[in-house]
Amino acid sequence: MGNMQERPSETIDRERKRLVETLQADSGLLLDALVARGVLTGPEYEALDALPDAERRVRRLLLLVQSKGEAACQELLRCAQQTVSMPDPAWDWQHVGPGYRDRSYDPPCPGHWTPEAPSSGTTCPGLPRASEEEEIGGPEDSEAVQPRTPEEPELEAEATKGDEPDLEQEMEPEPEPEVEPEPEPEPEPEPEPEPEPEPEPEPEREPDFQEGDESEGCENT
């Protein structure tokens, strides 16, 4: 386990070889994490990310972070620990003691390389300056970038004015189609009452022929 009183910059010095070997595969993710934490600026990130050699990229990154102070070194070690997919528990740099977490960036560590001033246009050592890139480009690049005439802003302003009504028309929401009310269901017709059955007529009584015969017999007698 590492020394709890050891500074993060001293830990980087002691474990520099292992850091360079281990962080090469995930150097891009490490750069992203350092930019998100504010350790690296945008130009520094672009300059380091443009280096094709991963080993050289990590070496430059360690030097650049050490020049920013102990707080930046502590952030680098923390990001490296989170970035490495399979950390080795025997590595001492993963057990750096707390003490620099909430501090602002300190002045450069003594005995380490200090980056040049921002006015020089160089973000990392060994990278070409902006003036050198312009010289390399030659007169062809300078001719390609022509100064803008004062008439161009007026044309652009007119074009933007002409586009404003179109933008307003596009921003207006389209009216929603009216939803037709659903027709109410028609009431079901009530069933007609069944007609009452008519009473059957009573059968007529047949005349009693026997009584007539008897009366006729009596008269004959």
From Swiss-Prot:
<keyword id="KW-0106">Calcium</keyword>
<dbReference type="GO" id="GO:0014736">
    <property type="term" value="P:negative regulation of muscle atrophy"/>
</dbReference>
<dbReference type="GO" id="GO:0005123">
    <property type="term" value="F:death receptor binding"/>
</dbReference>
<dbReference type="GO" id="GO:0014808">
    <property type="term" value="P:release of sequestered calcium ion into cytosol by sarcoplasmic reticulum"/>
</dbReference>
<dbReference type="GO" id="GO:1902042">
    <property type="term" value="P:negative regulation of extrinsic apoptotic signaling pathway via death domain receptors"/>
</dbReference>
<dbReference type="GO" id="GO:1903215">
    <property type="term" value="P:negative regulation of protein targeting to mitochondrion"/>
</dbReference>
<dbReference type="GO" id="GO:0001666">
    <property type="term" value="P:response to hypoxia"/>
</dbReference>
<dbReference type="GO" id="GO:0005102">
    <property type="term" value="F:signaling receptor binding"/>
</dbReference>
<dbReference type="Pfam" id="PF00619">
    <property type="entry name" value="CARD"/>
</dbReference>
<dbReference type="InterPro" id="IPR052685">
    <property type="entry name" value="Apoptosis_Repressor_CARD"/>
</dbReference>
<dbReference type="GO" id="GO:0070301">
    <property type="term" value="P:cellular response to hydrogen peroxide"/>
</dbReference>
<dbReference type="GO" id="GO:0019900">
    <property type="term" value="F:kinase binding"/>
</dbReference>
<dbReference type="GO" id="GO:1903298">
    <property type="term" value="P:negative regulation of hypoxia-induced intrinsic apoptotic signaling pathway"/>
</dbReference>
<keyword id="KW-0449">Lipoprotein</keyword>
<protein>
    <recommendedName>
        <fullName>Nucleolar protein 3</fullName>
    </recommendedName>
</protein>
<dbReference type="GO" id="GO:0019902">
    <property type="term" value="F:phosphatase binding"/>
</dbReference>
<dbReference type="GO" id="GO:0010659">
    <property type="term" value="P:cardiac muscle cell apoptotic process"/>
</dbReference>
<dbReference type="GO" id="GO:0051562">
    <property type="term" value="P:negative regulation of mitochondrial calcium ion concentration"/>
</dbReference>
<dbReference type="GO" id="GO:0048659">
    <property type="term" value="P:smooth muscle cell proliferation"/>
</dbReference>
<dbReference type="GO" id="GO:0005739">
    <property type="term" value="C:mitochondrion"/>
</dbReference>
<dbReference type="GO" id="GO:0010880">
    <property type="term" value="P:regulation of release of sequestered calcium ion into cytosol by sarcoplasmic reticulum"/>
</dbReference>
<dbReference type="GO" id="GO:0005737">
    <property type="term" value="C:cytoplasm"/>
</dbReference>
<dbReference type="GO" id="GO:0097193">
    <property type="term" value="P:intrinsic apoptotic signaling pathway"/>
</dbReference>
<dbReference type="GO" id="GO:2001237">
    <property type="term" value="P:negative regulation of extrinsic apoptotic signaling pathway"/>
</dbReference>
<feature type="lipid moiety-binding region" description="N-myristoyl glycine">
    <location>
        <position position="2"/>
    </location>
</feature>
<dbReference type="GO" id="GO:0006376">
    <property type="term" value="P:mRNA splice site recognition"/>
</dbReference>
<feature type="modified residue" description="Phosphothreonine; by CK2">
    <location>
        <position position="149"/>
    </location>
</feature>
<dbReference type="GO" id="GO:0010804">
    <property type="term" value="P:negative regulation of tumor necrosis factor-mediated signaling pathway"/>
</dbReference>
<dbReference type="GO" id="GO:0001974">
    <property type="term" value="P:blood vessel remodeling"/>
</dbReference>
<dbReference type="InterPro" id="IPR011029">
    <property type="entry name" value="DEATH-like_dom_sf"/>
</dbReference>
<keyword id="KW-0963">Cytoplasm</keyword>
<dbReference type="GO" id="GO:0089720">
    <property type="term" value="F:caspase binding"/>
</dbReference>
<dbReference type="GO" id="GO:0016020">
    <property type="term" value="C:membrane"/>
</dbReference>
<dbReference type="GO" id="GO:0010667">
    <property type="term" value="P:negative regulation of cardiac muscle cell apoptotic process"/>
</dbReference>
<dbReference type="GO" id="GO:0045445">
    <property type="term" value="P:myoblast differentiation"/>
</dbReference>
<dbReference type="GO" id="GO:0010664">
    <property type="term" value="P:negative regulation of striated muscle cell apoptotic process"/>
</dbReference>
<dbReference type="GO" id="GO:1902109">
    <property type="term" value="P:negative regulation of mitochondrial membrane permeability involved in apoptotic process"/>
</dbReference>
<feature type="region of interest" description="Disordered">
    <location>
        <begin position="107"/>
        <end position="221"/>
    </location>
</feature>
<comment type="function">
    <text>Apoptosis repressor that blocks multiple modes of cell death. Inhibits extrinsic apoptotic pathways through two different ways. Firstly by interacting with FAS and FADD upon FAS activation blocking death-inducing signaling complex (DISC) assembly. Secondly by interacting with CASP8 in a mitochondria localization- and phosphorylation-dependent manner, limiting the amount of soluble CASP8 available for DISC-mediated activation.</text>
</comment>
<dbReference type="GO" id="GO:1902176">
    <property type="term" value="P:negative regulation of oxidative stress-induced intrinsic apoptotic signaling pathway"/>
</dbReference>
<keyword id="KW-0479">Metal-binding</keyword>
<dbReference type="GO" id="GO:0090201">
    <property type="term" value="P:negative regulation of release of cytochrome c from mitochondria"/>
</dbReference>
